[in-house]
Amino acid sequence: MGLLLLQSGEKDTQIPHTSDEIYYVISGDGFLRIKNKDYPVSQDKLFFVAKDVEHHFHSNTKELKVLYFFGGPDS
């Protein structure tokens, strides 16, 4: 578990992870790109990203606060 903080316009430098991941958006806006598709990000939204899948947040106009959890079948 952790907290991702991105300032307005800050680049998200994530690389694919070896575990599944769940994101919970605490506050902010922008988009989450998973593979080649963009999903709108806003407060209280949840997202699932499977392991080894490219993804990153972008185009946030406010500070973005996201709680994340790693896991999988063996967790």
Model-derived features: positions:
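Structural motif
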Residues: M1-L3, D20, L64
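A short glycine-rich, His/Asp/Glu-containing loop-to-beta-strand
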Residues: M1-Q14, G71
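Conserved beta-strand segments that form the floor/walls of ligand-binding pockets within enzyme
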Residues: L5, R33, F48, Y68-F69
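Short, conserved beta-strand element in jelly-roll/cupin
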Residues: L5-Q7, H17-L32
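Short histidine-centered beta-strand/loop micro-motifs
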Residues: K11-H17, H58-S59
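Short strand-coil-strand connectors
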Residues: R33-K37, N60
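Short acidic-glycine-tyrosine-enriched beta hairpin
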Residues: N36-K51
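Ligand-binding loop in jelly-roll beta-barrel domains
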Residues: K51-S75
